[in-house]
Design a protein with these regions (language model features):
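Extended terminal accessory/targeting regions
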Residues: 1-132
Length: 132
């Protein structure tokens, strides 16, 4: 039932979710999670909201929500959108480094590579912001 699926709470709003998995990058209070409203209201759109790893998953929902809100506020302003993308990468990497704290932990490099891929995907979807 599609309607029931949209009524489910996302993992980051679940009271049982572990805050440390978000690395201090929280979903802003004003964020509206509603995929029926489009890509700016569904966390990480067509990508997983978490970096899956043995043990603890790094939760990117906060970073994606902040990026969604930034784009919604500044859509059409190329310079502002580039700043949104830069902050997005920083937030994703912050989550990775907070969740996987040892440089020797292979999950850290995997998470950082995933963060870079998410950033590159966003840039690829909006090339006009970069090539003007």
């Amino acid at each position: 039932d599609l309607e029931a699926e949209f009524k489910e709470k996302p993992v980051t709003q679940d009271p049982n979710a572990i805050e440390e998995d978000r690395g201090g990058v929280e979903v802003p209070d004003g964020y509206v999670y509603d995929p029926s409203r489009g890509a700016l209201h569904d966390y990480c759109t067509n990508s997983p909201d978490q970096f899956p790893a043995p043990g603890v998953n790094a939760d990117f929902s906060g970073a994606c929500a902040i990026h969604d809100m930034c784009y919604e506020k500044d859509y059409g302003n190329a310079d502002a959108m580039v700043a949104c993308d830069t902050a997005f990468l920083k937030n994703l990497r912050t989550v990775c480094k907070a969740v996987y704290t040892s440089a020797l932990d292979p999950r850290l490099s995997g998470c950082l590579n995933t963060a870079d891929t998410y950033y590159k995907a966003v840039v690829a979807v909006h090339p006009k912001n970069y090539f003007r």
